[in-house]
Swiss-Prot record:
The keyword Protease applies. It catalyses: Hydrolysis of proteins to small peptides in the presence of ATP and magnesium. alpha-casein is the usual test substrate. In the absence of ATP, only oligopeptides shorter than five residues are hydrolyzed (such as succinyl-Leu-Tyr-|-NHMec, and Leu-Tyr-Leu-|-Tyr-Trp, in which cleavage of the -Tyr-|-Leu- and -Tyr-|-Trp bonds also occurs). Cleaves peptides in various proteins in a process that requires ATP hydrolysis. Has a chymotrypsin-like activity. Plays a major role in the degradation of misfolded proteins. ClpXP1 is involved in the complete degradation of the Site-2 clipped anti-sigma-W factor RsiW. This results in the release of SigW and the transcription activation of the genes under the control of the sigma-W factor. The lineage of its organism: Bacteria, Bacillati, Bacillota, Bacilli, Bacillales. The active site is at residues 98, 123. It comes from Bacillus licheniformis (strain ATCC 14580 / DSM 13 / JCM 2505 / CCUG 7422 / NBRC 12200 / NCIMB 9375 / NCTC 10341 / NRRL NRS-1264 / Gibson 46). GO terms for molecular function: ATP-dependent peptidase activity; ATPase binding; serine-type endopeptidase activity. This is ATP-dependent Clp protease proteolytic subunit 1.
Length: 198
C-alpha cells in the first residue's frame, strides 16, 4: 500500500489540500525516493522543466534515497539537470546507490550534500544478455561503452583520476557520508538544514 500524506494549507481563499510531493514542489524540492525507471525519470524531468519555467534563476533541490536503476532513465535526469538554467542541489537521505549516487554527484558543485547517516554506493553498470552470440557481443560492447561514459563523467564530477574511478567502481563500493565527501561525490555533510546555507 502506497500512502501519500496530504497537507492542508490555509490561503486567502480558504483551505487547500496538497499531496506532500506537490507541496514540496512549491518550495522547489523534488523527491527521488525509489528505483529509477522511465516513469520516475519522466516525472523528475517534468518537474525540473516546470520549475525552470516558473523561475529560471532560483535553485532546485533534489532529495535522493534511491537504490539506482536504469542507466538510460538516469541519464535523462542527468542531462536535464545539466541542461536547465537553475542550479540543482542534491541531498542524499538514506542511500544513494548506483545511478542514485551518479545523480547525487551530478548536482551543482558546492551544493551536493548528504545527511550524516546516509550511504553512497558506486559500482560499474549491471546488465545481461541472451540470444545469439552476435547479440551478446553487441550488448557487451554497449555496456562497456556505457561504463566508460559513466566513469568519465564521475571522474569529472568528483575530481578523481579516471584510473581511480575505474578501480573503485569495479565492485560495489560503499561510502559513509564523510567518505563520500572526501572522495568528491558530495561537498558537505549536513547535520542541520541551516548548514546548507553556510
Amino acid at each position: 500500500m502506497n500512502l501519500i500524506p496530504t497537507v492542508i494549507e490555509q490561503t486567502n481563499r480558504g483551505e487547500r489540500a496538497y499531496d506532500i510531493y506537490s507541496r514540496l514542489l512549491k518550495d522547489r524540492i523534488i523527491m527521488l525516493g525509489s528505483a529509477i525507471d522511465d516513469n520516475v525519470a519522466n516525472s523528475i524531468v517534468s518537474q525540473l522543466l516546470f520549475l525552470e519555467a516558473e523561475d529560471p534563476e532560483k535553485d532546485i533541490s533534489i532529495y535522493i534515497n534511491s537504490p539506482g536503476g536504469s542507466i538510460t532513465a538516469g541519464m535523462a535526469i542527468y542531462d536535464t539537470m545539466q541542461f536547465i538554467k537553475p542550479q540543482v542541489s542534491t541531498i542524499c537521505t538514506g542511500m544513494a546507490a548506483s545511478m542514485g549516487a551518479f545523480l547525487l554527484a551530478a548536482g551543482e558543485k558546492g551544493k551536493r550534500y548528504a545527511l550524516p547517516n546516509s550511504e553512497v554506493m558506486i559500482h560499474q553498470p549491471l546488465g545481461g544478455a541472451q540470444g545469439q552470440a552476435t547479440e551478446i557481443e553487441i550488448a557487451a560492447k554497449r555496456i562497456l561503452s556505457l561504463r566508460d561514459k559513466l566513469n568519465k563523467i564521475l571522474a569529472e564530477r568528483t575530481g578523481q583520476p579516471l584510473e581511480v574511478i575505474e578501480r573503485d567502481t569495479d565492485r560495489d563500493n560503499f561510502k559513509t557520508a564523510e567518505e563520500a565527501k572526501e572522495y568528491g561525490l558530495i561537498d558537505k555533510v549536513l547535520t542541520r538544514n541551516i548548514d546548507a546555507q553556510k
